[in-house]
């Protein structure tokens, strides 16, 4: 699956997810942070699921109907576990993400919000 990792996601997650067969771009490799709205736009344009720790992306998608290609928000996981958790969500919820779902993942809990604004 094509992914765009937000700068707040541990940089080591890029290599781990790439090794698992995903096509991964990490915004931390860029010379500057384009900001939330532009980052979500890039993910939508490139049809990449955005992976973040930041709840602002959900607000952009839900309240402001900013188009996206799916969002995974990781809450409460140590940096070194982010890729593992993301990989489990990608494997278990591929159809939902392909349909533009916003998935919030916390230890012991997964919340899925289908999106009508998917790219």
What are these regions (language model features)?
Residues 18-19, 37, 65, 83, ...:
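Ribonuclease/tRNase effector modules and their secretory precursors
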Residues 2-48:
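N-terminal first-folded block
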Residues 42-44, 67-71:
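Short, hinge-like loop/turn segments at secondary-structure boundaries
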Residues 71-113:
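C-terminal structural segments of small proteins and small subunits
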Residues 14-15, 36, 60-62, 83, ...:
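Short glycine-/acidic-enriched loop or helix-start segments at secondary-structure transitions
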Residues 1-13, 106-119:
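Metal-dependent nucleic-acid phosphoesterase active-site entry motif
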Residues 43-61:
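Acidic, metal-binding active-site segment of PIN/NYN-like and related structure-specific nucleases
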Residues 28, 54, 74-75:
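Short beta->alpha connector loops at strand-helix junctions that form conserved
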